[in-house]
Amino acid sequence: MDSPSAGYTFEYLIETLNGSSQKKFFNVPKLGGTKYDILPYSIRVLLEAAVRNCDGFLMKKEDVINILDWKTKQSNVEVPFFPARVVLQDFTGIPAMVDFAAMREAVKTLGGDPKKVHPACPTDLTVDHSLQIDFSKCAIQNAPNPGGGDLQKAGKLSPLKVQPKKLPCRGQTTCRGSCDSGELSRNSGTFSSQIENTPVLCPFHLQPVPEPETVLKNQEVEFGRNRERLQFFKWSSGAFKNVAVIPPGTGMAHQVNLEHLSRVVFEEADLLFPDSVIGTDSHITMVNGLGILGWGVGGIETEAVMLGLPVTLTLPEVVGCELTGSSNAFVTSIDIVLGITKHLRQVGVAGKFVEFFGSGVSQLSIVDRTTIANMCPEYGAILSFFPVDNVTLRHLEHTGFDKTKLESMEEYLKAVKLFRNDENSSEPEYSQVIQINLNSIVASVSGPKRPQDRVAVTDMKSDFQACLNEKVGFKGFQVAAEKQSDTVSVRYDGSEYKLSHGSVVIAAVISCTNNCNPSVMLAAGLLAKKAVETGLRVKPYIRTSLSPGSGMVTHYLSSSGVLPYLSKLGFEIVGYGCSTCVGNTAPLSEAILNAVKQGDLVTCGVLSGNKNFEGRLCDCVRANYLASPPLVVAYAIAGTVNIDFQTEPLGTDSTGKNIYLHDIWPSREEVHQIEEEHVILSMFKALKEKVEMGNKRWNSLDAPDSVLFPWDVKSTYIRCPSFFDKLTKEPAASQPIENAHVLLYLGDSVTTDHISPAGSIARSSAAAKYLTNRGLTPREFNSYGARRGNDAVMTRGTFANIKLFNKFIGKPAPKTIHFPSGQTLDVFEAAELYQKEGIPLIILAGKKYGSGNSRDWAAKGPYLLGVKAVLAESYEKIHKDHLIGIGIAPLEFLPGENADSLGLSGREVFSLSFPEELFPGITLNIKTSTGKEFSVIAAFENDVEITLYKHGGLLNFVARKFL
């Protein structure tokens, strides 16, 4: 699949770097002259990749010229892009690797060589989404069977000790340092040593740290519960070239990508070029804060890139975001993120690049920039790019980047004009320029149901009370006025407490957006320290947790001395990876659950993540607010969100004196001092060694040694999927969709969580019935995310979210109507009946169908249910790409029209056909059983998408390339 002569067209642009007789690069500025100088920095990266990979086949000279003429061609042409590398996490990585394994089977069946099937692009797979919180401080539960979910012996697996693969060095000749003996168990001498801690081994540093035993217990269960999946990952790393697996306990995909995998500048065979990445996690965009172009795409598109094909995108508009002014002392990076998020949503940047410039940029640290870049999927942009500048270089130097490589990097970036300097008198030209004054941003939270609904902390009490009054919706709970002051007494751990509307029952400093930001994490720790010293405590029934993005967070919280104080308030480290963030939180106590149900209370979760969709944390927690880590701690201490921090105290000290938030809020100077002393110079030291060394449990895993994976028919984790069952050597003509029924009639903002849940498997679900019939107990079900390698589970889990609102049913429930019989059934059961009857299916939806996390099973699941098309008002781009990639037609109502305006009930039978010649944006005609006809748009953006659809999806298209 490799290009025959990549770079040949523009070989004359290759030059030698001045400071080196060996290092070469494409001097792209010579190609464009003044045209190049006005290009946004992010577009310059696209242009370099196009020049370097131009072979006249996958990348044409016309594509290069189109990118160079970005000013006139933006939004009008499609361009291919070859990223330098790919990053996967296990939730989406396992179906990708299962598809690769299944593709080998299909290629062999049709007479091809299965050994040819392997990634052509460097691929790093981070196992970070399998962590579930079985143990926490509040309730050490009975451990699930460490072998849970693995009752079936993998009889076909031939044991082989696979040595951990050494990962390529990312931007340095030596590791970024190592932990000194006992380094993590030291506490700063400036802090009290009265709090005693039981040292355990940090799975990141393999050094004693003062944290509870919950980390090791959760990791032990994680390895037992997911042994079969982990063995498959290990087989993949040995069977496929260019695949490196980063084992559990290291950190989240996007954070490991930032801390370890990022190179900023690649070097292959003495050729220098910009680092770039695409991945299956939408938060891969975090690396744009480091000057690395990267964004999230679907799992199917990622597989294509892994096979040497480019990812295709519409040449984007680039919105220049000029930051001016400076933030005030009480605003955290998260406040800046949420402020920018709200502003960009209001402006409208969906499907565009955002590029930051202006005097305010230099005031933001790399961790601030990466936090802002990480949130870009929440305001709809493809990515948010911060060009490399002096702040970037200082960060790399402080984190141990090899000085020689750093010098070459700076020289190269300046030679190709990819280095941003405040002294430059001119900025690139942008499609649009917006200004954000950092002085205008105030401390805020977001909620109670959506990340874009930002509320100033000063307005929080009045806003929550307004939400109680409002009718049920994104900002309403419709609680009767006479019940808004209701309280329910509850006895917990021998003491009496009162719960009311607004009571906090979950407080989580969790993975994703915030844990990589030392300033906000240290601010939370310093606030906890001051709170403990003044005698403030968190009520014991509140489910508190701290789930770091990586072991570095443990390192700097420990070495700065604030970890014991967080622990004292209940914020103990429960593990490394995505937990509460993706619905894997430990359950609330029965006493609290009963009290909430008894009073029909609107209780709250406060978390420092980036998603707060309804029901994501816990079914009984109706209001969820996103906040900075110090505010999470503050609201946990207050015990309610129904508080005005300016006028109401958090509590009292031992003398009865009122303690207000401003009394314990750390100053910016305090935070920066601790950050300099305990973070910047040491936080990156041991990550590279830890990743390459792996951990003991991972290294001891057995894995098969074979070209084809030995599928176990008894397995409930890994199954050969049916995507290739009907694969032929040549694609058939596009078939019409005739007499299709509507499986679901959905509204606006249907998320991929609604379509394909990632959390726990409900006992009453179709997936649970399947697993129970195979001898598993509920404690062994694991989560949907963990079972993405089993198409039978994932198909049954499609549309199984209890918060799914199907207009056919009229209330939230994973149900639908099977119209031929009139029965109300689980969605899977209804789809199964339709398939037995040979009836094709479509889905009706509103605006923003498929929003939220990138999730390829949100397309694969409907495909296996028999869905042939989705008809919506609009789509989230990644999800639309997934639909095309699996062979489902994405149809859009004409502008201004929807199912209601057309008078559709969803009970009609629909038919449409496709012409032989499809083209992007073609209008199709739909006929219904009532005689009504209307037009829709086929939402194909380019000829590549049309080709993929005609092949029955990307997997079939790629498999045929090997025959």
Swiss-Prot record:
Its cofactor is [4Fe-4S] cluster. InterPro entries: AcnA_IRP_Swivel, Acnase/IPM_dHydase_lsu_aba_1/3, Acoase/IPM_deHydtase_lsu_aba, Aconitase/3IPM_dehydase_swvl, Aconitase/IRP2, Aconitase_4Fe-4S_BS, Aconitase_4Fe-4S_dom, AconitaseA/IPMdHydase_ssu_swvl. Keywords: 4Fe-4S, Cytoplasm, Iron, Iron-sulfur, Metal-binding, RNA-binding, Ubl conjugation. [4Fe-4S] cluster binds at residues 512, 578, 581. Its main location: cytoplasm. One of its GO terms (biological process) is response to kainic acid. GO terms for cellular component: axon; cytoplasm; cytosol; neuronal cell body. It is found in: Cytoplasm. Binds 1 [4Fe-4S] cluster per subunit. [4Fe-4S]-binding affects RNA-binding activity, thereby inhibiting activity of the protein. Belongs to the aconitase/IPM isomerase family. Interacts with RBCK1 only in iron-rich conditions. Interacts (when associated with the 4Fe-4S) with FBXL5. Interacts with CIAO1 and CIAO2A. NCBIfam families: aconitase_1, PRK09277.1, PRK12881.1. RNA-binding protein that binds to iron-responsive elements (IRES), which are stem-loop structures found in the 5'-UTR of ferritin, and delta aminolevulinic acid synthase mRNAs, and in the 3'-UTR of transferrin receptor mRNA. Binding to the IRE element in ferritin results in the repression of its mRNA translation. Binding of the protein to the transferrin receptor mRNA inhibits the degradation of this otherwise rapidly degraded mRNA. This is Iron-responsive element-binding protein 2.
